[in-house]
Regions:
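Compositionally biased intrinsically disordered regions enriched in Thr/Gly
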Residues: 10-252
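C-terminal motif of bacterial Sec signal peptides marking the signal peptidase cleavage site
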Residues: 5-8
Length: 252
């Protein structure tokens, strides 16, 4: 998915960003197995790679580092308020070592974990990054998810759903997104819609802003078959102007 966010100079308390994408971990190991006619290969390749975006702005880099650390380390990592880059490297190393150990114990086709970091753009006080996480631990294909970080540079925090739409207004947002989804599926004549009920439908916590509205991103399998990848549902500005926090309304 390609996202273009326009940079604007007014009301910014950070300069136009010069973002560097750094590879902080990249290890590949081959685990060899005794030859067997039952298998098509006699080895498994283990790949773990991690990227981190850096801006040169201390508070922003720490926020991005902590978020990446949480993505890689899981719930336990949330207890660490100020992880270092070395802490993140150790988490990648742990994933790599666990993959290798698992491959030695059980014959596998391979395993991989890739964390990619992308700078999407800046508009006034909103700075947007994304992380793509690709994992493969066996089977016909791996899994890819895209996670967004919309950072308010005034508040120095990553925005959550409750920041942009109050909880008591989210049922209206859900209705808007559900209508977009059903129209999308009907136009595509996609019978996958029968597998998702309105009661089971939720507002994705992954979103990004653009000139059309707020785009909510759902991972493969959540709303459509795997082959379609991420599904993006758009809440257009005119549909949500009465429920969105005015601070984050691009069309006010």
């Amino acid at each position: 998915m390609t996202t273009v966010l326009l940079a604007a100079c007014q009301e910014q308390d950070v300069p136009t960003l010069q973002v560097k994408k750094n590879v902080i971990f990249d290890q590949v190991k081959t685990v060899n197995y005794p030859h067997s006619d039952e298998y098509t290969t006699d080895n498994a390749q283990i790949e773990v790679r991690g990227e981190l975006s850096e801006t040169g702005i201390k508070w922003l880099d720490q926020l991005l580092l902590k978020h990446a650390y949480t993505l890689v380390g899981g719930e336990d990592s949330m207890k660490k308020d100020t992880p270092t880059k070395q802490d993140l490297v150790q988490k990648f190393q742990q994933i790599h070592d666990e993959f290798v150990q698992s491959a030695k114990e059980d014959r596998v086709l391979g395993a991989s974990f890739h964390l990619t970091s992308n700078y999407l753009g800046q508009r006034n006080n909103i700075i947007t990054f994304s992380n793509d996480i690709d994992t493969y631990t066996g089977g016909a294909h791996g899994i890819n998810v895209t996670l967004f970080q919309n950072i308010d540079s005034h508040k120095k925090k990553i925005l959550e759903l409750n920041d942009i739409v109050k909880q008591d207004q989210q049922s209206k947002l859900k209705e808007v997104l559900w209508n977009f989804y059903t129209n999308l599926m009907e136009e595509a004549n996609d019978d996958y819609i029968g597998m998702i009920t309105k009661e089971d439908f939720n507002i994705s916590e992954q979103f990004y802003f653009n000139n059309e509205g707020i785009n909510f991103v759902y991972p493969p399998y959540a709303l459509r078959a795997y082959a379609y990848g991420n599904v993006v549902l758009t809440a257009y500005w005119h549909e949500i102007e009465d429920i969105i926090n005015p601070e984050y309304n691009w069309k006010k």
